[in-house]
Amino acid sequence: MASTDFSKIETLKQLNASLADKSYIEGTAVSQADVTVFKAFQSAYPEFSRWFNHIASKADEFDSFPAASAAAAEEEEDDDVDLFGSDDEEADAEAEKLKAERIAAYNAKKAAKPAKPAAKSIVTLDVKPWDDETNLEEMVANVKAIEMEGLTWGAHQFIPIGFGIKKLQINCVVEDDKVSLDDLQQSIEEDEDHVQSTDIAAMQKL
């Protein structure tokens, strides 16, 4: 026999075919060719060879051995199913663990970043009274009494606009995402005893 590489299935097939009509590898008696093939097969499949030789030694007792238990076979089959199920569960658990770790890492990275400062603007408002008899001090007090989250009142002044009438010009700083200027103007104009109208005179991002 040319090849003794029994790791290849083709070699096993060739050996089986060559022994179809003879009892030895070469000739009509045991020779070193048989020994070489035997050792090569045993080297390639040591556990199978050990099992085969062990079972072959008990050939005379084959009929006395008990049949395989159906319950045991079924239990073994169930164990196999459970085993595969366990593998799936372990894989799912591992995937969930990895997902949780990634989310935690993302949140930690996000938390580590410094918070962006709130966008703010400085706004100058013109508040016009009804006439020259309007009490401007009361009007400015009412304006500054308005409180909103993100609103900070600043300096003010009274500017003449004609016929003895003065308007209130007042500065404030607002957080853009918290303070609506429309709402702020509406709140000021609710002081109907003093305020005729309001306008945004200037606005600049900080």
From Swiss-Prot:
The pathway that the record names for this protein is: Protein biosynthesis; polypeptide chain elongation
Q: Which InterPro entries match?
A: Arc1-like_N, eEF-1beta-like_sf, EF-1_beta_acid_region_euk, EF1B_bsu/dsu, EF1B_bsu/dsu_GNE, Glutathione-S-Trfase_C_sf, Transl_elong_EF1B/ribsomal_bS6, Transl_elong_EF1B_B/D_CS
Q: What is known of its domains?
A: The C-terminus (pos. 119-205) exhibits guanine nucleotide exchange activity.
What's the source species for this entry?
A: Saccharomyces cerevisiae (strain ATCC 204508 / S288c) (Baker's yeast)
Q: Does the keyword Ubl conjugation apply?
A: yes
Q: Which residues carry this modification: N-acetylalanine?
A: 2
Note the subunit structure.
The eukaryotic elongation factor 1 complex (eEF1) is probably a heterohexamer. Two trimeric complexes, each composed of eEF1A (TEF1 or TEF2), eEF1Balpha (EFB1) and eEF1Bgamma (CAM1 or TEF4), are probably dimerized via the eF1Bgamma subunits. eEF1Balpha interacts directly with eEF1A. eEF1Balpha and eEF1Bgamma form the eEF1B subcomplex with the GEF activity.
Q: What does this protein do?
A: Catalytic subunit of the guanine nucleotide exchange factor (GEF) (eEF1B subcomplex) of the eukaryotic elongation factor 1 complex (eEF1). Stimulates the exchange of GDP for GTP on elongation factor 1A (eEF1A), probably by displacing GDP from the nucleotide binding pocket in eEF1A. The 30-fold higher concentration of GTP compared to GDP in cells favors the formation of eEF1A-GTP, which rapidly forms a ternary complex with aminoacyl-tRNA that in turn displaces eEF1B from the complex.
Q: Which GO terms describe its biological process?
A: maintenance of translational fidelity; negative regulation of actin filament bundle assembly; regulation of translational termination; translational elongation
Q: What is the effect of changing residue 121 to I/L/N?
A: Reduces translation efficiency and enhances translation fidelity
* This protein's record includes keyword Phosphoprotein: yes
The name of this protein is Elongation factor 1-beta
- Give the similarity note: Belongs to the EF-1-beta/EF-1-delta family.
This protein's GO cellular component annotations are:
cytosol; eukaryotic translation elongation factor 1 complex; ribosome
- How is this chain modified after translation? S-thiolated in response to oxidative stress, probably inhibiting the protein and causing a reduction in protein synthesis.
